[in-house]
Amino acid sequence: MFGYVDSRAENNTFVPASQVQRPSMFGWGRSRSRSVFISTFCPRGKTVFFGRRGYVSDCMDEWIGLMGGSVTYAEEAGAGEDWLRRLAPRLDFILVDESAAEDIRQLVEHCLFLRRALPEVPLLLLSPSVKGDDFGTERMAICDVTLRTPLSQAAFVRALRIARSNNRRYVGSLAAPQPSALRA
């Protein structure tokens, strides 16, 4: 069991890690008990996670909670297209863990479905099988950012910022005239 020994207590009491109040980078700039990061990353307060519960989902739960948001697990909610569309106005971003699919083809199809259903919601792909984080726009058709797992909280925060920017580009590309339409 992970934890800390509280040296301030009379008998150096052991405190489990889950009960320790740790300082957080999200604590700086608090205004009326709300972090500045809440309005930046989780203004609507909801994230959907596609994937199996485990270490990655636990980290996402904790980090998003620190930002003032909450995570809904799609498998537990029975996520279909109608459910996603109803939830869309409250969504800040979508997380897709590679564990959500049986193979890469199914993963890509799932991401394409999410992109078509909710193009305006930033989509982050989490995968242990990629060589490194990818913040470019080459995979724009399926996601805004790809993160290699396991990942750090700092990488996650950076990815959220970049995912929003990449998503604006993606939505803009949908509105732009297509090259084939220009020739006609």
What kind of region is each of these model predictions?
Residues 57, 81, 87-118, 130-134:
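Conserved phosphotransfer microenvironments
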Residues 137-147:
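As written
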